[in-house]
A protein has these predicted regions:
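Gram-negative outer-membrane beta-barrel transporters
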Residues: 404-407, 504, 525-627, 696-698
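Face-selective signature of the C-terminal outer-membrane beta-barrel domain
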Residues: 250-273, 301-425
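Outer-membrane beta-barrel translocator/receptor signature
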Residues: 91-94, 104-185, 191-197, 248, ...
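Membrane-embedded beta-barrel scaffold of Gram-negative outer-membrane proteins
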Residues: 255-257, 263-269, 273-281, 452, ...
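Acidic/polar loop-and-plug regions of large Gram-negative outer-membrane beta-barrel proteins
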Residues: 169-173, 186-257, 261, 270-310, ...
Length: 699
């Protein structure tokens, strides 16, 4: 009820009375999950959020209401892009706020565009009583993890603080041939004076994996003919398949309360990240080809090295305050944001020659994969395959007007967004801009009841185009539009939220060409006809529309010893005159979007054993279509986790906490769905039954 969340442009606000849907995960909530990645921790309880990657795959991010948000698009302390590409670290996470829905006007436009959600991480700071905790954990199959959390405050009013966190994990996962080596370090130093608050953060994370990336590609082209999900221990690629992710972030943020009823905040941060290793794209066979004798097999494809670099500079400066015009209150805010991201991708000099065709029905995939050899060259091309810079500048204004003793609140505002994209490889630069408006309202007929609604937009950069005269232009950013209405009610020991939303996102032509510049899918494709009329790749065409209803409830029952939660989302994802990945117009449903997702959890502080807490979590994912015409769908599945936590105190400060859990108790075999651009459908094998045990000692 009293969760204070960071809403970027709107400042810190009460999550219960906010005019948008926002969920806060505090440090204890994240730590108690003991998920190996941040996305797995966040996605396990909210029905409108679905993880992709995480522990199951080295490609990492979240889906909000059916749309994708990559890990590199997460914000840290309000600074965009500071989490790092394919990041999984959580050692520095003090809290995480999920803002659901289109949010460009509130949070600013990501350099590469994002739709339907934002995630902001607040870093850990030293508590008033200090932080002193060490931990040791074991995760199946044979991973050992050590953690340390040391923090202290100094000064007469404890105005100075430092906090350091570390996590090391190494060993074999439950999946055959899949092992990881994870290192995470975080340092925070902060000053909190009467008016000025300043914080410095430094975060380093490196994750090395073997056998950790095995994603089945382009299932939509195989008419959905994918074999049944195997046991989660099964690896679709050999153990020599490897990827490393490394990232370093440094940032400085501040808040200053002036003598004139307004506050100034700002920050600057720099993140450098790298993702490198082998790139292999296993593909299901549609029918008999030179590579496959029948359908329902898959070919591993060949292996090639990839080396991807990301450099992001992020800064912001904002001011907010309050004044009155008669009986009407005004909470105003203004913000300037600037983000510069540089991307470069290098490839190996060539792909390997070895490949293998796998017959899943024969079993013993490891034996079949033995024919697939790591014969790829270990040399990299001297020139980048992708070399680009994206600059995003924006200026935002908003005013929240309070009427009727602030029980009726109307927020109006917008953000002017300027984008500059430079393709260094092609020596092309394009610029564009757009204004993204927002309108929000919240009505509080009583302190425990809130009706709210909003209209917001998300922006994504458009493509650069060069005409026959050599003039380079860039279309205005693509606009996705959201309408949302909801109601929250505090019943005392139970809080409920019901909301309905619609998000409409434009499609755009792929216009794929081969090395000779010819259209990949021939002159009979719908794009070929469009191009003949003067159209071009990247032009907007058709739309995808997600309409849904969410219901969430959580409570504190039995004298706050029983903590249940439940969430349900029903969503339709429709395509209308939407360009497919094969440059054909389609009408139908979007792939990899379960229509129904439900999640429930419970924690019980037992009365018969002081310090003992039992917990359970259930996740249900409805069937999801893997082609737009609904000819094939992955079946629904349910995951069940159970766990326990016991804390024994020794004196005033010392305490030992032992916790453990079994995830995927019934060892459910399932495909974890993922989406690519257009109507591309991907999937990875879900993780098998997993055990873990952890001991933390606080002193």
């Amino acid at each position: 009820m009293l969760d204070r969340v960071n809403l970027s442009l709107l400042g810190r606000a009460n999550a219960f009375t906010a005019p948008i849907t926002v969920v806060n995960y505090d440090e204890n909530r994240i730590n108690n999950k003991q998920a190996r990645t941040l996305v797995d921790a966040v996605a396990s309880t909210d029905a409108s959020v679905m993880a992709f990657g995480g522990e199951s795959n080295t490609l990492t991010g979240l889906y909000f209401r059916g749309f994708q948000l990559d890990a590199r698009q997460f914000s840290v302390n309000g600074l965009a892009g500071m989490y790092g590409t394919q990041g999984t670290a959580d050692v520095h996470v003090g809290s995480a706020q999920l803002i659901k829905g289109a949010s460009t006007a509130v949070t600013g436009m990501d350099p590469e565009g994002a739709v339907s959600g934002a995630l902001n991480i607040e870093t850990k700071k030293a508590s008033d009583d200090g932080n002193r905790k060490v931990g040791l954990a074991w995760f199946s199959d044979s991973r050992v993890q050590t953690t340390a959390d040391i923090g202290q405050r100094f000064g007469e009013s404890k105005q100075f603080g430092i906090r350091a966190n570390a996590k090391l994990r190494h060993g074999d996962t439950p999946r055959d041939g899949y092992k990881e080596d994870d290192k995470e370090f975080a340092f925070n130093a902060d000053y909190r004076g009467e008016k000025l608050r300043v914080a410095f953060d430094s975060v380093y994370a490196k994750r090395k994996t073997h056998g950790g990336r095995a994603r089945m590609q382009d299932i939509q082209n195989a008419a959905g003919k994918l074999f049944a999900a195997p046991d989660g221990k099964t690896n679709l690629l050999p153990a020599w398949n490897w990827q490393n992710t490394v990232g370093q972030t440094n940032m400085l943020t501040f808040e200053y309360d002036t003598d004139h009823s307004f506050q100034i905040t700002g920050g600057i941060g720099y993140n450098k990240a790298r993702y490198y290793g082998t790139l292999i794209s296993p593909t299901i066979c549609r029918n008999a080809t030179t590579a496959c004798t029948t359908a329902n097999q898959y070919t591993t494809g060949t292996a090639r090295l990839t080396d991807q670099y990301f450099r992001t500079l992020s800064m912001n400066l904002s001011a907010r305050g309050e004044f009155y015009t008669g009986p009407v209150s005004h909470n105003w805010s203004t913000a300037f944001d600037r983000i510069i991201r540089q991307r470069a991708t290098y490839r190996g000099t060539a792909a390997g020659r070895s490949t293998a065709t796998i017959y899943p029905e024969r079993g013993n995939l490891a034996g079949q994969l033995a024919a697939f050899k790591p014969d790829y060259p270990n040399r990299m091309e001297s020139n980048a395959n992708l070399d680009a810079r994206i600059k995003v500048n924006s200026l935002a204004l908003s005013d929240t007007l309070g009427f009727l003793d602030n029980t009726l609140r109307l927020t109006v505002g917008g953000r002017f967004q300027h984008v500059e994209y430079t393709d260094k490889k092609a020596n092309e630069t394009g610029k564009s801009h757009r204004i993204s408006p927002m309108l929000m309202a919240a009505w509080l007929p009583s302190p425990d009841l809130v009706f709210y609604g909003n209209y917001m937009q998300d922006l994504e950069p458009a493509d650069i185009k060069t005409d026959d005269d050599g003039n380079t232009t860039m279309a205005k950013p693509r606009v996705s539009r959201q309408f949302e209405f909801g109601v929250r009610k505090n019943w005392g020991d139970v809080v409920t939220t019901l909301s309905a939303f619609q998000i409409k996102r434009p499609g755009y032509w792929r216009g794929q060409t081969n090395a000779n510049g010819r259209l990949t899918y021939g002159n009979n494709s719908d794009f070929a006809k469009y191009k003949a009329q003067g159209g071009a790749a990247g032009d907007e065409q058709g739309f995808e529309r997600n309409r849904g209803v969410e219901f969430n409830v959580y409570g504190n029952l039995m004298n706050k010893t029983l903590h249940p939660s439940f969430g349900l989302m029903y969503m339709r994802s429709d395509l209308r005159k939407y360009p497919s990945s094969r440059d054909m117009l389609i009408n139908g449903v979007q792939v990899a979007s379960p229509r129904v997702i439900a999640k429930a959890g419970i924690e019980w502080d037992t009365p018969f054993a002081q310090g003992l807490t039992l917990n359970a979590n259930v996740q249900y994912y409805g069937k999801s279509y893997q082609d737009s015409q609904k000819k094939y769908a992955f079946p629904s599945y349910t995951l069940v986790d159970i766990g326990a936590r016991y804390t024994k105190k020794f004196g005033e400060r010392n305490a030992l906490t032992v916790s453990g859990a079994v995830e995927n108790v019934f060892n459910k075999h399932y495909w974890q769905v993922q989406r690519g651009q257009y109507d591309r459908s991907f999937a990875v094998v879900g993780m098998p039954r997993t055990f873990w045990l952890k001991a933390d000692y606080s002193f």
